Curated annotation (Swiss-Prot):
Keywords: ATP-binding, Carbohydrate metabolism, Kinase, Nucleotide-binding, Transferase
Positions bound to ATP: 9-16
A single GO molecular function term of this UniProt record: kinase activity
EC nos: 2.7.1.170
Described purpose of this protein according to its UniProt entry: Catalyzes the specific phosphorylation of 1,6-anhydro-N-acetylmuramic acid (anhMurNAc) with the simultaneous cleavage of the 1,6-anhydro ring, generating MurNAc-6-P. Is required for the utilization of anhMurNAc either imported from the medium or derived from its own cell wall murein, and thus plays a role in cell wall recycling.
UniProt-recorded name of the protein: Anhydro-N-acetylmuramic acid kinase
Record-linked NCBIfam families: PRK09585.2-1, PRK09585.3-2
Length: 390
């Protein structure tokens, strides 16, 4: 099957689309990446999304409108990846669309129950592409008592399980998340959880203090020095000592977190603040390994993915933090994969599993009570001989 996986993450840097060919289903699936592209959000769209993400500025009319606007953006991004790959859109069997997360409440707080909302109307995507769309992957896991995240571990088992090596898959997107993938000969279970901020705090500081979207290659942070009092403040965040399974997001490490941090520590130089929040991401990852993984698993290899794997300063901080551990550290490209395409590929794989009526949540990752089939199915408006028959 030819499937387009569509991902718009918490970093808001654009729409990632992976055109993937998948043979079979389950852990023995054969996955081939045909083409990957990122379609950036225009400034107006990015501003609308940021407005919708903030409780202070959001409103129901905006979210309602944005749901349809993003659906059109996602459809156009699918058309773009097919155009770049010289692949006929009519031959596409499925689209797996994660959507744009507007709010994620992993655990109940008072009368606010655990819930999640991703937008990007699948009917618009299906209409514009005349292709079956599978979307809204997180809600069924939450209905089954899970946190709806992380969902990527299922794809990581398929793509990265090694015959003899125990691997850690560390994604550094807006949020950091880790998956422990034991070797095929191991009897240990897969576990996965969010490790805290990935690029989210770094990018927000860059945009506010340096007026650039992100710290390319970690060059700005390299000019500063880590400030202990800022790092201690960050590392005291209660999320870090919660036991897995757990997930987090912009609600904990978004604009409000950065505003409070900058107000508290405005006496320090811009470069030092950026260096410190970069170290915060590295230390939060290392902390989670040492607290929740390394005492129970012998790890051979750490594989970094996501945009943060291109931040050389951050990667060097991670290497220093893990220097005493007996494991190698590499990035996705070192083993023939794409750091940028990883999550979009994951949602193509999840769409394929839903098409085959296979459960694809990992209970040890999300905390769900049951293995469940993820996602909602939206059929295209017109019958087509190439349409996937679900």
């Amino acid at each position: 099957m030819y499937i387009a996986g569509v991902m718009s993450g918490t970093s808001l840097d654009g729409i990632d689309v992976a055109l993937v060919h998948i043979e079979g289903s389950g852990v023995d699936s054969k996955i081939e990446l045909i083409h990957f592209t990122t379609v950036p959000f225009c400034n107006d769209m990015k501003n609308e999304i940021q407005q919708a993400l903030s409780i202070e500025t959001s409103n129901v009319q905006l979210i309602c409108s944005l749901n349809f606007k993003l659906g059109l953006c996602f459809a156009n991004a699918v058309k773009e990846v097919c155009k770049e790959a010289n692949f006929p859109l009519r031959q596409l069997d499925l689209i797996g669309s994660h959507g744009q997360t507007i709010y994620h409440q992993p655990k109940q707080e008072g009368n606010i129950i655990s819930s999640t909302l991703q937008i990007g109307e699948p009917a618009v995507i299906a209409y514009e592409t005349n292709t079956t769309v599978i979307s809204n992957f997180r809600t069924m896991d939450m209905a089954a008592g899970g946190q709806g995240a992380p969902l990527v571990p299922y794809s990581e088992i398929i793509l990265y399980r090694h015959q003899t090596k125990n691997r850690l898959l560390q994604n550094i997107g807006g949020i950091g998340n880790v998956t422990v993938v034991p070797s095929k000969r191991s009897k240990e279970s897969v576990i996965a959880f969010d490790t805290g901020p990935g690029n989210m705090v770094i990018d927000e500081v860059c945009q506010r203090l340096f007026h650039v979207p992100y710290d390319q290659n970690g060059w700005i942070a390299k000019q500063g020095v880590v400030v202990d009092e800022i790092l201690t403040y960050c590392m005291n965040h209660p999320f870090l000592n919660m036991k897995p399974p757990k997930s987090t997001g912009r609600e904990q490490f978004g604009e409000a977190f950065v505003t409070e941090l900058l107000n508290r520590f405005k006496k320090h130089s811009k470069e030092n603040i950026l260096a410190t929040v970069t170290m915060f991401t590295a230390c939060s990852i290392v902390h989670h390994y040492k607290a929740f993984i390394l005492p129970y698993y012998e790890i051979d290899e750490v594989i970094l993915g996501g945009g943060g794997s291109y931040n050389n300063t951050l990667v060097e901080m991670l290497r220093n933090g893990l220097r005493e551990e007996k494991c190698s550290i590499c990035i996705q490209e070192d083993i023939g994969h794409s750091s940028a395409a990883k999550e979009a590929i994951a949602f193509a794989i999840l769409a394929n599993e839903t098409y085959h009526r296979n459960p694809s949540n990992v209970l040890s990752a999300t905390g769900a009570k049951n293995s469940v089939i993820l996602g909602n199915i939206t059929f295209p408006p017109y019958a087509d001989e190439n349409e996937a028959n679900i």
